Amino acid sequence: MTKCRRRRLHLSNIYAFKGRKSNFQEDHSHIGGPGFSRVVYCNEPNSPAAERRNYVGNYVRSTKYTLASFIPKSLFEQFRRVANFYFLVTGVLSLTALSPYSPISALLPLTFVIAASMVKEAIEDWGRKKQDIEMNNRKVKVHDGNGIFRREGWRDLKVGNIVRVEKDEFFPADLLLLSSSYEDSICYVETMNLDGETNLKVKQGLEATSSALHEDSDFKELKAVVKCEDPNADLYTFVGTLHFEEQRLPLSITQLLLRDSKLRNTEYIYGVVVFTGHDTKVIQNSTDPPSKRSRIERKMDKIIYLMFGVVFLMSFIGSIVFGIETREDRVRNGGRTERWYLRPDNADIFFDPDRAPMAAVYHFFTAVMLYSYFIPISLYVSIEIVKVLQSLFINNDILMYYEENDKPAHARTSNLNEELGMVDTILSDKTGTLTCNSMEFIKCSIAGTAYGRGITEVERSMAMRSNGSSLVGDDLDVVVDQSGPKIKGFNFLDERVMKGNWVKQRDAAVLQKFFRLLAVCHTAIPETDEATGSVSYEAESPDEAAFVVAAREFGFEFFSRTQNGISFRELDLASGKTVERVYRLLNVLEFNSARKRMSVIVRDEDGRLLLLSKGADNVMFERLAKNGRKFEEKTREHVNEYADAGLRTLILAYREVDENEYIEFSKNFNEAKNSVTADRESLIDEITEQMERDLILLGATAVEDKLQNGVPDCIDKLAQAGIKIWVLTGDKMETAINIGFACSLLRQEMKQIIINLETPHIKALEKAGEKDAIEHASRESVVNQMEEGKALLTASSSASSHEAFALIIDGKSLTYALEDDFKKKFLDLATGCASVICCRSSPKQKALVTRLVKSGTGKTTLAIGDGANDVGMLQEADIGVGISGVEGMQAVMSSDIAIAQFRYLERLLLVHGHWCYSRISSMICYFFYKNITFGVTVFLYEAYTSFSAQPAYNDWFLSLFNVFFSSLPVIALGVFDQDVSARYCYKFPLLYQEGVQNLLFSWKRIIGWMFNGVFTALAIFFLCKESLKHQLYNPNGKTAGREILGGTMYTCVVWVVNLQMALAISYFTWLQHIVIWGSVAFWYIFLMIYGAITPSFSTDAYKVFIEALAPAPSYWLTTLFVMFFALIPFFVFKSVQMRFFPGYHQMIQWIRYEGHSNDPEFVEMVRQRSIRPTTVGFTARRAASVRRSGRFHDQLNKNFIAF
């Protein structure tokens, strides 16, 4: 590519807007009006007029807090959690005389938990702060007003500054391109940081500025004004005018260089700062993704509210009883106070028998504080710690690392780990997600002749379906075996056209035009390796790159592009030698989703004007001239065959353009592109529509987007897990169906329910152009087809058959199916089918379908995609998984979890998802179990003491229970436990349904753990009380008091809750042993150390262990007996459950324990305990065969009964 500046060249108007004197008849009404009020004084950032505008500076802050706001704002964030707020209230109440314990013992645990969360917030925010400092201190050359550019920090830039950005530097703000190192003011930009796309974009300045501003010194006298739109988040549009040298020139997105994009393949550019800081488009787009919370977390909130209700109910009951007892105290004893030790004569206390109602009210507040231990204060912070550690395991899983691209899995948020184990429906994009998005040119049709002998994966799959033998596939592999190195983007084999043999074909002239079109009709950028001389290409899409590579392999090598021309080498038909040709590039009629085609207008070396065009078959065939349809019939046949083979097709055509016609077109085209009106795009489309007509057909291309490695096996395994899989794609129905067969999403035995609008009646209405009639007929047709499909499902269900159905619907039909009146019908039909494929669906439709499934089923949905068109779907789903593939990183940046290949979804869900769900479920249940155990002992002791608000335990015993003596084991459970190993998660994928049906966190299981806690507390309290009631506790004749009873009960609680944890764990690691037995040991260590402190601090715990508990045999015997008795119910329940109604994971654990894990009969027996039959994938095919033959059915039933 030419690097020097070229002067006095005739500049074309290819990509941008030709600088010209203003036509004041144009509509400039937007500029200066609402939404278009920005005025930029170029080269005068400090002028009074500019200062009055008061635009924001270029300093960017992404931090959540400032130094001044951190403490108040982070405290507010912490106390928004209802549990934290509750503990704050109880902490404040502890400062009053109502408190049953010392204030410091109440406030210290809360302070610890809040401080831990705030430290986490501070660390995360400091990371953002460091990024801000690094970015704001970057340097760029800024014009000082005297023709000299000096390096300044990004943070100091102002609107109106002129900057010089050099190769491989980032743009510091949104800049208006004035000129570049190229004479015609083009530059190449990489927008990876904006939209994730790695291909280069072409930008071009106005001719007026590029011809006047060449060197640094040219900017000394620059005076210009930009009037444009106000700051907004739209990355793809920009409207404004430049007032320069008495001209008013229209501006578009082509002249705008966006902050954080990078200058590539261009030595330097000059630009004027238009938007700064938080006004730039990239920052305007930096909104937080939608906040997502897992179902378990939302249910946990409900449990917290339930516990609040229990606490207040207990406090209310205790207060009523206390009030009655206080009033009856004197009545029963003839006016004498029986409980004299409560000192009712003391005005500072609240137990006056003469004021019993007030005593009850005061007691209520005391009880609320005393029973606060029912609420697990460390639950939230423990779960956050566990989820972060779980995310680290996901991120560092070597089995989800894609070495080829150096891409590991990345959990971008840890909030949804357990949700990965509850997915009911997967909604997947196709291109780049199920397929590689690495296009290979494999076949083509030229002049009605089909070329290319390659066999696609879909054709191989179709052959296997038809013949039912893997030998067919083996034979096909031999056919496509090729010698020589693999060429990226090219997998074509046909000796008739390779190595220059195309010149010997009957239609060599047509073949030459076809290959020339591939070499010229594109926007690819060539890059030549100076060492080897080989040419590689930067293209806007993998398809386009494949076309250019194919042209090169056919002997038409595109090797250079300038703003005005395209250069390529080809084999000359006349001389038989390779020659270089240069076509002058006049216009590029760019592709968009509405046009479904792109064209270029070029002038060849003979001076002829040519329109070269490629596009979708449905828009290209209708634009053919009468004399251009010579090969149409054969080409249509070949296109249909290619679609059946799962290939992506484009039609190639051309025509010669009359000189006068082009002059008129160029005039109208330039006026349309230079207009500053809201309908600019429609004007351009209207003009190009007139040019892209009367085309002469050359042929069609067929490129294969191969399935990613492991996709069929992954889909098969997910289907065995009972997960439904929907595919939402923009491809044609035929292509999507055949890809569905190739990846086993569809199978031969399935009945296909196809909904489309290809009926003769609707086609006739379309030809007549009756819009209202078309809409009415289309809506009616879609509804009728849905009702017919539902009737098929109902009939199959009533017949108790094993038929599986697949729903396939196109984008037009989907528009009507998603209407409010019919979407429930559509959802009922779709959820009754084993597979759903939505074809020709738009990004908006993908998001709407995802929303419908999520809200309509109430189950967890996962969306997976790789492109910008999948962002809405990813954000709408409960979990968004981004594929870090070829289409850039925009999907990844909008996702919750990123993986490199679809096949990693199997391990992410079946292993990590199941483990995280199982761990978090057990962890939360255990948290409430241990707190109920501890809290009920406090309640029982208070009831035993006539609700006198006397705590059963020392203040510090109360405070440290949740923090030091019981939290670490439960955190270890949440991080390390495995109910079954990864191997068995794969072997028995139906285990995953435990999460889908939420069996491990059902209300039945939660309530069961709560009752277990209540029983444990009852056993501990009454056994300890009765064991110590009438005994002499030491040689001096002293009986057990509160400190001894409390110490014994506390010891039993610590032992029992930790032993219960040990019994609940399925997979022990050395770390779990350390934290469980270490927590118990730490209790004894703490008791000795705390008891050795002065009595003024340790109060009744002073030497209680050394002098009272440890020497007494009854203490140790009671502890041992209570532990045994309190854990018996759990043993009994587990034994009965394992014997009579085992969970799925328990069945797997048992056959592994019995040594039957490798016995095919036992393995198949467990699989037969399906919660949901497998209806897609290879396994479904085998299962269908088994059902038809009835093999092993009776034997499996016998085996299960015996088991």
UniProtKB/Swiss-Prot annotation:
Annotated localization: Membrane
Catalytic activity: ATP + H2O + phospholipidSide 1 = ADP + phosphate + phospholipidSide 2
Positions in the Cytoplasmic compartment: 1-71, 121-303, 382-921, 976-1005, 1065-1070, 1134-1203
Keywords: ATP-binding, Magnesium, Membrane, Metal-binding, Nucleotide-binding, Translocase, Transmembrane, Transmembrane helix
GO terms classed as biological process: phospholipid transport; protein localization involved in auxin polar transport
UniProt membrane topology term: Multi-pass membrane protein
Active site: 429 (4-aspartylphosphate intermediate)
Stored CDD domains: P-type_ATPase_APLT_Dnf-like
Pfam families referenced in this protein's UniProt entry, alphabetically: Cation_ATPase, PhoLip_ATPase_C, PhoLip_ATPase_N
Gene3D superfamilies attached to this UniProt entry: Calcium-transporting ATPase, cytoplasmic domain N, Calcium-transporting ATPase, cytoplasmic transduction domain A, HAD superfamily/HAD-like
Highest rank taxon of the organism: Eukaryota
GO molecular function list: ATP binding; ATP hydrolysis activity; ATPase-coupled intramembrane lipid transporter activity; magnesium ion binding
A GO CC annotation given for this chain: membrane
Binding site for Mg(2+): 866, 870
Transmembrane intervals: 72-93, 98-120, 304-325, 364-381, 922-941, 956-975, 1006-1028, 1042-1064, 1071-1091, 1109-1133
Topological domain ranges for the Extracellular compartment: 94-97, 326-363, 942-955, 1029-1041, 1092-1108
EC numbers, comma separated: 7.6.2.1
Its biological purpose: Involved in transport of phospholipids.
Record-stated family: Belongs to the cation transport ATPase (P-type) (TC 3.A.3) family. Type IV subfamily.
Protein name (record): Probable phospholipid-transporting ATPase 11
Protein's organism: Arabidopsis thaliana
